[in-house]
Each structure stands twice: as C-alpha cells, then as structure tokens.
C-alpha cells in the first residue's frame, strides 16, 4: 500500500509537479476540484479540523505538521484570506496537511500527505490513487474527481493529504497545473458540471472561490492543505473541510492524540497519512491514527481518507459549495467558519468561493458537497474523511464514495470513514475494521471511486450512481445541503444510513442520507466543528452549521466534538465526532452507542455522506461526473467499488457502493458497521441495501477486495483508474477489482442464478446494468454431487479430521504437561519440606541443599545442582562467572538453600555480606563473637605485619569455610561420598562445584539429613576446619576461596595482580600468603572485595586439629586432583586460569614455602606433593607469625 502510495505519491508529486499528467492533473484538477472543493473542504475542514486538530493535533503534531501544514496552510491560508484560517488551518493543516505535503513530498508514498499539502500531491494523491484513472481529461474532473476522488482515495489512501489533497488542490499551484487541468475542469466546469462544477467548485473553491479562494485555493492549492484550508477557510467549512480532509487529516492530528480523530479525520488523511505522516502532517494524527489504525493508517486507509477528502473535496466543493452557499453557506460557512473559526469570514469568502464552488456547485452537488465537505469537512473535516466523510456527508457521499471509496480502498473509512470510518478506523476500535479496511480500504477506494466516481463520475454517472446520482445534483446539492444538516443527521443516521446513503445513493437514500447525511454532515461539520469546535470552539459551528443539525451534530459533535474533536473531528465530526462525537453526532444511536460505530456512523456518515455525497456526488458528480467519462468509470469504479466490494466480498460488495463505504467505513462501517456497525452500519447496510453502498457496510470486507476492484476500477476509470491503483493498493482484498466503478449504474443486489454448469451454479450477486460485463459480481456454488463439491467435502473432512487429531494430540500433551507439573509440584513440596527441615536444622545450608535434592542422596552433588537449579550445561563459564559476580558474594551460592550459601554466610556475614549463620555457628551471638575474635586476631596479625597465626590463618580460611566447601568442592569430593567428578560439575552450575564440594565435604556431616543439627554443625565445623587447614594450602585455599572456579578464576584473573601484590605484600609483610591469610595478605578474598577483617573464618576459629589435618589430607589428595575436579565444573578457560593462578601461586609459594616450611603446622604439612609444599608453605606463612 505504502509502496503504491509512494508511487502514487510520487506520481502525484509528479503530477503535482507536472501539469501535464492529465490524469494526475485531472486528478489534481479533480483532486483539486475535489481538493479545491474538497481541498477547500479539506482545507476548511482542515482549517477547522486544523483548528481543532491544530489545537489538538497542533499540540500533537502541530509542530511538524504544523510547520508543514502551517507553511502550506499559511501559504494557502494566508494566501487565501484564510489567514485566520490559515493560521488555524495552518495549524490544522499544519498538522495534518503540511506534514502531509511535506511529508508527502518527502514521502513519496506520503505524497499523499504532500498531496494534502500540495495540491499536486493532493491531486497527485488523487492521482496516485486514482492517478491512472484520474487522468481522464474529459473526465478530468471526473477523473479528477474520480481520480482525484479515487486518487484521492488511493492517493489519499496514500495521503490523507488527499484529504488535504483538496489541499493539494491548493497545491493548486502545482496542482494548479492540474488546476490548469482543473481549470480545464473548471472549464470543464461546463464540462462536467461537476467537472466544472468540481473544478469550479473545487477550483472555484480553489481558485474560483474567489480570488482569495483561488488564492486561498491556489494557495490552498499551493498550500494544498491550506488551500483547502483557506478555501475551506473561506468555506469556513472549507477550513473545516480542509480540516476535514486535513481536519480529517488535521483533525486527525488532534485525534492524533485521539487517534480516532486522527484516525477519523486524519485517519482519512492523516491517520492514513500517518503513514503518510506528512499528511499526518497531520499525521500527527497520522501517527495517532496509525496508532489507531496505523496498520490501516499506514496503509491505504489514510489515503482513502485523503481520497475521500479529495473526493469529498472535489465533490464537496461542488457539493459543499452548493450547500454551503445554499444551506451551508451560512451554516456551512458558519459551520465552516466554525470549522475554521477563522474560516468564518474566510468561510465567507470561501463560502463565496463556495458559492463559486457553488457555481460549480451547480455541480453544486459536488460543490455543495464540497462545500459541505467543507462544511462537513470543516465540521467533518474531521472528516477529512469527514471532509470526505463530511464531505462525505456532504461529500460524504463523496468522500464516502469518493473519499470512502477513494479511500475506501485504503481508507474508505477515511473517506467516509474519514469522517466516519476513519474515526472508526482510527479512532474506533473500528480501527480494526478499518484495518480490515485497510484492506477493506481498497474496496473503499473502489467505493471511493464509486463515490469519487460518483463524485467525479457521478456527474456522468449520477444516474449510475443511481440514487447517488439521483440524489445527484439536486440531491447532491440538496443533499449537501441537507446533507449538511442531515449530514449531521445523516451522519448520525448516516452511519446507518450512510450505507443507506451510499446504498441508497438514490436520492431517497441519498436524499435521506443527504438529509441525514446533511444532518450528519452537518453533524459532521458540527462534528467537525465540534471536533474542531472541540479543538476550537466549534460551538458556533453548530450554530452555524445547520443550527439544528448543527446543534445536533454539534451537540453531538460538540459533545462529541471535543472528544470527537479528535474523533469526530477526525472523522466527520460526527464520524469523528461520531466516533466520540459520533455517538452523539451520529444521532444514530448505533453510532453513538458503539464507539466503534460512531466511527461507523462516521462511516455511516461517510456512507450516508457517501450516499449523500454519492448522491450528491452523483448529483454533484453529475456535475462532476460531467467528466462523466471517467465519471462513469469512476462511477463504474464506484459501482465497481461495490462490485469490487462485491467482488471482494460478493455479498459484501454487492452493495458495491456500500462496500466502498464499507471499505470506507469498514472499520467503522464494515468493521463496525457490519459487526458493530451493523446497527449503525447495518442501517447503512440496509442503506446499502438501497444501493451497493449499503452492502458496503456489509461489504466492509468486500470492500477490501474492492480496492483491487478499485484498481480494476481504475482501469475503468481509465485515467482515474490509473491513479486508482492505489485503490488497488488497498486492493487488499477481496479483490474484485472495482473496475467498473464508474459510470455503471449503482449495482443492484440481485443474487439470481445466472448460469449453471455440470459442477457449479453461478449466482449473480450484483447487477451493474450495462456495465456488468467484466464485473466479478458472480459467485459460484458447487452443485451437490459434483466432483468439485466432493473435493470440497473431502477437503473439509480432511481438515476436520486433522483438527480432531490435533486436538487429541493437544489434549494428550496437556495431560502430559499436567502430569509433569504435578511431578514438579511434588518435588517442590518435598523441597520445601526439606528446606523447612533444613532451616530448622542447619537451615542455612546443608539442609537447604538437601532440600533441593531431597530425593538425591544427601551428599549427592546432584543436590547442589538441584540447588543451583538452572544448570546451564556443561560449560557456560562466562555465564557462570557473570552470574557469580552478580551474586552478592562470589563465593556464595545465590540461593539460601544452597549448601554453600551458608558457607558464605558461614564465612562471615560481614565478610560475605551474607547474613547467613556461620557454618558452624548458627548462633548469631557465637558468630558475632567469633567474628570479633577473628577480626581482633586479624588486626593483631596485620599489625605485626601480617603475622598470621595458624588460627587466624584458619579463620581466614574460614572464609574458605564456606570456601572450604568450595575447596571440598574441589578436592573434598574425594572425601565425600559423592564422586568427586560428579560433584564438581554437578554442583557447578554456578557455584556448583564449590557448593557440591562443600556439599560433599560438608555434606558428609552437614548435608547428611540423618545428622542432627548439632552433629552437622560439628561435622561442618570440622569440615571447615579441615578445609581451612587444607586451605592453608594455597591451592586448596585458593580453591576454597574461590569457591567457584570462576570466582576463583575471577580472583585470579581479576587479581592475578592481587596475587602478586599480595605476594609482595605478604612478602613484604612477611606475612601471610594471600592464600593463607587472604585477608592479611589481601588475599583473594581481599581481592574479591571482602573486607579484610571480615574474612575471619568462623570455621577455623580455632586451630585445626589433627583429625582435621587428616581430613585435610584426605581432602588434600582430592585437592591435588582438584584441578581435575575443579575442571569438571570449570570451563577450560577457568581451569587454565585456575591452574595458571595456582601454578603461579604454587611457584611463588614454593619459593616462599621454604621459609615457612619449618613453621608450617603438621597438618599443613600434610604430605601433599606440590600442594603440600604449597600448602605447608601457606601454613607456614600463617604460622610463621606464630
């Protein structure tokens, strides 16, 4: 989608840049017209929305979008006399539009935005969307409309800017060329009355709207958003519209916050734009919209919004213009003014332009829609979609059609959604729908196309549009007019009716919609206004909008407005508002009720609007359609939209238009409508019933396909189609290409069997009149008994069987898992029990370790492993080391249950920082005493120069006490029952080895569950002493100290330096070898950041005894093996390091040993090879001081 968008964007850009691109131009024109009108609408809406948005979004996205928009907006605005508006709009526009433009520009895809910003883009967007299609020279307007609308849809899809596109129209400047084209359109004015109308409307709106408008328009055009804005501004509604578009976009921005709004308005544009942030410019909203339906938004959806805008704009200009002038002018103008507060005056002018548009308004239908859109837009602007939606309403039909359809595909919602959907889409939960929409959007585009076509084509195809068409000009105008009022209503109802409107594009539908639409629209405007109002004081808006509706809308919108502001705003007010406002706005309960629905309503509005717009568009589009060729195609497209929809979702689509709507509304509508929206949407649906549109609601999904259809439509649209491809982008779906969207009469849902073959019966779902040739409105059902049926049945059966099988397997797995869990729970319970026991006893460690491995033999190293549950595997030195370091103390196992945990604690809480009971002294007092004694000793020792007394030495060792476990861990294994090898690694997981060893060593006594606490303590103490003795052995000591290999390693690596320093130190101090008296010498422990004094090891508070020595020897031997045993737990690196450290230490010790050897204790003298020496030496070191 994005790509397409980009492409389109580019195209658009191109278009913008190029006057030439007929389609583009056309689109542009159309877009412009649309944008002009719509743009204005957009702009106005934008202004309005802008304002609101600006306010809201302003804050949100104001910055960027603001800048962009502002620039553009200002450009336009200023240009236009919308200065006021401009600022606001700027804001608004800024928000959505500028960004859009800029972004768009920036982003190809975002072009949309740009479009919004820039006319070209806008148009381009249209183009983009509908570009191919767009270009229908004759159809320019149509095309433009269609294209624009479509394009807008698509383009818009791309860019909310299309929303802005109307703005883009402003880009008139660029688009101006298109404008030229457009102008031609204007020329075309006669041409299709909507062409002219549109152009006039649009254009007029844009340029015609009065010089200012033109300026504004131009500016708007140039500014695009602004243009829109300004025209909008002038339109008042225009601003709103702009806002609508922009507002949609812009509002979106406000919605940005409320994504909804964004979604809605922006959604249409910005939200959609979000992707097109540019549009978001308004993509602020975009962003939000994205949030809302970023997916959607990013997707085409936004464009649709844009598109709708465009469409709406395009149409709306006429539409808007007319109603505006007629009905709207005041109200709308007001509304618009309201929409663009500043626009008020501007609105006046704009209005004037509107009137200009009005003239086009002849095309009026479009113009009014446009105007309306403006109004709507303005109000709706939020409905950029609104514009679209509103516009849609007014333009809603448009937008719906156009926008919606346009967007439909992407953002059908944007279109209508824009107003209606969009919010839903964005704002709404509908969003999802919308998202679907996103997919759906394509359909919407189709619809949009439809609408657009309707809008654009409507002229030519008004009839095509059927009701839409029917509503057509008069209706359109009326619609718009009504729409405005009604749009409000419509919006409210619209939602329901939207479809209706859509569906019932027929005047009745349309009309009603228009009425409703008008109401709704008005609501939109109001909504928008509200939105805007919300954003900015829109209250006047309401007044100004059709007071009644205005109020309604307003009130709805108003109330909602603010909320809607974002929402409503975004969408149409109603829609958006609908959304929030929606609720109120869409008087429709459903809409109101379902939040999503509100969007739906919005959508509905769109729908209604669409309808209306469509009607209007159709009407107006009639004018527009004048550019019938594309028009029709567009319409066809539009119709196809339904078709597309239908195709996409045959049933859904059926409505075709509705699908479009659906698309447009899908989120709101379809998603909402159909689902939630059913009520709302449903109404729409029914509405849909009236026309393809209604189905749109249902077709929401289908609408998706329409996008493809849209593309298909695109072709039909011809030039428009081309741009329509973006719709295709939206194609997402259901793929019925909405090729013949244009002038074909609105598809009628027939559902009659058309052909039967041996194996299947084909049902014709939609009857598209003379345009049904290539439509894929058929769906076939395999006949029973046929091979196909059989195959399908088999497949189903197979799937069912597989599912059952899977379910069975799953159940078994579940059972297995349950059993597993049970087992684990059992283990845990056991563990807890053992832990409790352990805690009662030697809670600190042994028991815990036991606990962990209650099922294992007491000493089994495994227990340690269990203790260190996450056994990482054989060797994860780095991990282990890391985790070790992460521990409070390297030496101690992290978990309290750990056998060594206490050991660490045992070492000395102070030392280790563990407050665990000492290994041998659980009694805190005892521990305390001991520690004090040790510290005293140490101090004394240190004073004399590290004279370490063996006892002290041992105490230091004590550190190893826990370490001793470690040591044992290494060497102790032998001692232990557990196999040394076993313990090391098993324990080692992290502190495992040392724990294991400790377990094993200490385990002997300590771990053994059978031992009493006292025994265990005694044993442990012995063990500790033993170890400590061993500990004298530097190696052992090292090992012990480094309870864990890595710790050890760490010490080494970490402190080989320390070692050496220690050597120096202890050498200097003639004191203790680091190993021996780690503390004294700044031993490893010291190295390990233990407080020196705290090292005293509780275990060896007293000198070792012979038995300890013996033990020690026992240990010693294992200790010798230590490297091996250590190695198990250690990684190669660890081992190496440990070995290296050891060897270094050993060598140094050996040298030093000699001095101390004589001093060594016998026990230290235990015959150990090097170790013995080492160890003797260590001991000696200790003793030496003695």
Curated annotation (Swiss-Prot):
Annotated region described as Disordered, given as residue ranges: 1-604, 618-763, 781-858
Keywords noted in UniProt: Acetylation, Cell junction, Cytoplasm, Isopeptide bond, Methylation, Nucleus, Phosphoprotein, Transcription, Transcription regulation, Ubl conjugation
Subcellular localization: Nucleus; Cytoplasm, Perinuclear region; Cell junction
GO molecular function: transcription corepressor activity
Annotated segments matching region Involved in binding BAIAP2: 513-563
PTM (free text): Phosphorylated in vitro by MAPK8/JNK1 on Ser-735.
InterPro entries according to UniProt: Atrophin-1, Atrophin-like
Region (Required for interaction with FAT1): 875-890
Primary location group: nucleus
Known partners and oligomeric status: Interacts with NR2E1; the interaction represses the transcriptional activity of NR2E1. Interacts with BAIAP2, WWP1, WWP2, WWP3 and RERE. Interacts (via its N-terminus) with MTG8; the interaction enhances transcriptional repression of MTG8. Interacts with FAT1 (via a C-terminal domain). Interacts with PQBP1.
Protein name: Atrophin-1
Organism, as annotated: Pan troglodytes (Chimpanzee)
């Amino acid at each position: 989608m994005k790509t397409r968008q980009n492409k389109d964007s580019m195209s658009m850009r191109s278009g913008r840049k190029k006057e030439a691109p007929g389609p583009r131009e056309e689109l542009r024109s159309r877009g412009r017209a649309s944008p002009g009108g719509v743009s204005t609408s957009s702009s106005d809406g934008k202004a309005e929305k802008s304002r609101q948005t600006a306010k809201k979004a302003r804050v949100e996205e104001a910055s960027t979008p603001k800048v962009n928009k502002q620039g553009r907006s200002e450009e336009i605005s200023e240009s236009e006399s919308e200065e006021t508006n401009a600022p606001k709009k700027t804001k608004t526009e800024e928000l959505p539009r500028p960004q859009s433009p800029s972004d768009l520009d920036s982003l190809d895809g975002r072009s949309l935005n740009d479009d919004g910003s820039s006319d070209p883009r806008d148009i381009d967007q249209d183009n983009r969307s509908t570009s191919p299609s767009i270009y229908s020279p004759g159809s320019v307007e149509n095309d433009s409309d269609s294209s624009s609308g479509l394009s807008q849809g698509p383009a818009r899809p791309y860019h909310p800017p299309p929303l802005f596109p109307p703005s883009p129209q402003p880009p008139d400047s660029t688009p101006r060329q298109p404008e030229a084209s457009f102008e031609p359109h204007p020329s075309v004015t006669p041409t299709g009355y909507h062409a002219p109308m549109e152009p006039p409307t649009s254009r007029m709106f844009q340029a015609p709207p009065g010089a200012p408008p033109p300026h504004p328009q131009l500016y708007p055009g140039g500014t695009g958003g602004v243009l829109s804005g300004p025209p909008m501004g002038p339109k008042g509604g225009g601003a709103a519209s702009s806002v609508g578009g922009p507002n949609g976009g812009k509002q979106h921005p406000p919605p940005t916050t409320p994504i909804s709004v964004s979604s809605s308005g922006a959604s249409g544009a910005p939200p959609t734009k979000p992707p097109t942030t540019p549009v978001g410019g308004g993509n602020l909203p975009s962003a939000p919209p994205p949030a809302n339906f970023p997916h959607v938004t990013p997707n085409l959806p936004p464009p649709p919004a844009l598109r709708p805008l465009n469409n709406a704009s395009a149409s709306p200009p006429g539409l808007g213009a007319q109603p505006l002038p007629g009905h709207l002018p005041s109200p709308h103008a007001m509304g618009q003014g309201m929409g663009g507060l500043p626009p008020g005056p501007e609105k006046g002018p704009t209005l004037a332009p509107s009137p200009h548009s009005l003239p086009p308004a002849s095309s009026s239908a479009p113009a009014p829609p446009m105007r309306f859109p403006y109004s709507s837009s303005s109000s709706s602007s939020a409905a950029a979609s609104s514009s679209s939606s509103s516009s849609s309403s007014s333009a809603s039909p448009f937008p719906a059609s156009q926008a919606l359809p346009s967007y439909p595909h992407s953002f059908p919602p944007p279109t209508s959604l824009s107003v209606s959907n969009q919010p839903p889409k964005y704002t709404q939960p509908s969003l999802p729908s919308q998202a679907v929409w996103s997919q759906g959007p394509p359909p919407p585009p189709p619809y949009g196309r439809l609408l657009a076509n309707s809008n654009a084509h409507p002229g030519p195809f008004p009839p095509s549009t059927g009701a839409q068409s029917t509503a057509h000009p008069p209706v359109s105008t009326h619609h718009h007019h009504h729409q405005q009022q009604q749009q409000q209503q419509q919006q409210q109802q619209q939602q329901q009716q939207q479809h209706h409107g859509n569906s019932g594009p027929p005047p009745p539908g349309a009309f009603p919609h228009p009425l409703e639409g008008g109401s709704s629209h008005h609501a939109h405007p109001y909504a928008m206004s509200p939105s805007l109002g919300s954003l900015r004081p829109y209250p006047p808006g309401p007044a100004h909008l059709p007071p009644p509706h205005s109020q309604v809308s307003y009130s709805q919108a108003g109330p909602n407005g603010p909320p809607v502001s974002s929402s409503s705003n975004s969408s149409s007010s109603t829609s958006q508002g609908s959304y929030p406002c929606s609720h109120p706005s869409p008087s429709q309960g459903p809409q109101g009720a379902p939040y999503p629905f509100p969007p739906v309503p919005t959508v509905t509005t769109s729908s209604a609007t669409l309808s209306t717009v469509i009607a209007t568009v159709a009407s107006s589009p009639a004018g527009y359609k004048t550019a019938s060729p594309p028009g029709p195609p567009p319409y066809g497209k539009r119709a196809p939209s339904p078709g597309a929809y239908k195709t996409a979702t045959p049933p859904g689509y059926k409505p075709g238009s509705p699908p479009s709507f659906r698309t447009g509304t899908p989120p709101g509508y379809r998603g909402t409508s159909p689902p939630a929206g059913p009520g709302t949407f449903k109404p729409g649906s029914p509405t849909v019933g009236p026309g393809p549109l209604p189905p749109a609601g249902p077709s929401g999904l289908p609408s998706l396909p329409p996008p493809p259809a849209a593309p298909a439509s695109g072709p039909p649209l011809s030039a428009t189609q081309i741009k329509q491809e973006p719709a295709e982008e939206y194609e997402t779906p259901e793929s019925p290409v909405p090729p013949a969207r244009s002038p074909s009469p609105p598809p009628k849902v027939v559902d009659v069997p058309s052909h039967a073959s041996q194996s299947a019966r084909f049902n014709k779902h939609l009857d598209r009149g003379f345009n049904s040739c290539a439509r894929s409105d058929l769906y076939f059902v395999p006949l029973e008994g046929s091979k196909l049926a059989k195959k399908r049945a088999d497949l189903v059966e197979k799937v069912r069987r597989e599912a059952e099988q899977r379910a069975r397997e799953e159940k078994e797995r579940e059972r297995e898992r349950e059993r597993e869990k049970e087992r684990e729970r059992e283990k845990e319970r056991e563990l807890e029990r053992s832990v409790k026991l352990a805690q009662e006893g030697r809670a600190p460690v042994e028991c815990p370790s036991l606990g962990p491995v209650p099922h294992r033999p007491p000493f089994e190293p495994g227990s340690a492993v269990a203790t260190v549950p996450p056994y990482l595997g054989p060797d994860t030195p780095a991990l282990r080391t890391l985790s070790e370091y992460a521990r409070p103390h390297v030496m101690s196992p992290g978990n309290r249950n750990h056998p060594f945990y206490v050991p660490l604690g045992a070492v000395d809480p102070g030392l280790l920082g563990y407050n665990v009971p000492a290994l041998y002294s659980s009694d805190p007092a005892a521990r305390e005493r001991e520690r004090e004694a040790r510290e005293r000793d140490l101090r004394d020792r240190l004073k004399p120069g590290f004279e370490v007394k063996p006892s002290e030495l041992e105490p230091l060792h004590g550190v190893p006490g826990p370490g001793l476990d470690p040591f044992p861990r290494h060497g102790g294994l032998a001692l232990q029952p557990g196999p040394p090898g076993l313990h090391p690694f098993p324990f080692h997981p992290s502190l495992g080895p040392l724990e294991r060893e400790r377990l094993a060593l200490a385990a002997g006594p300590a771990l053994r569950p059978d031992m009493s606490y006292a025994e265990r303590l005694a044993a442990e103490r012995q063990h500790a002493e033993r170890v400590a003795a061993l500990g004298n052995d530097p190696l052992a000591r090292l090992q012990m100290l480094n309870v864990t290999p890595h710790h050890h390693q760490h010490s080494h690596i970490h402190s080989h330096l320390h070692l050496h320093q220690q050597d120096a130190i202890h050498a200097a101090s003639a004191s203790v070898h680091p190993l021996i008296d780690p503390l004294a010498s700044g031993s490893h422990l010291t190295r390990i950041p233990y407080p020196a004094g705290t090292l005293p090891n509780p275990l060896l508070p007293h000198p070792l005894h012979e038995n300890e020595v013996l033990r020690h020897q026992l240990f010693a031997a294992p200790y010798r093996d230590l490297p091996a045993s250590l190695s198990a737990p250690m990684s190669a690196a660890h081992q190496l390091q440990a070995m290296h450290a050891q060897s270094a230490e050993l060598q140094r010790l050996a040298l030093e040993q000699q001095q101390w050897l004589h001093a060594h204790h016998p026990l230290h003298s235990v015959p150990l090879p090097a170790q013995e020496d080492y160890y003797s030496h260590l001991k000696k070191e200790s003793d030496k001081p003695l």
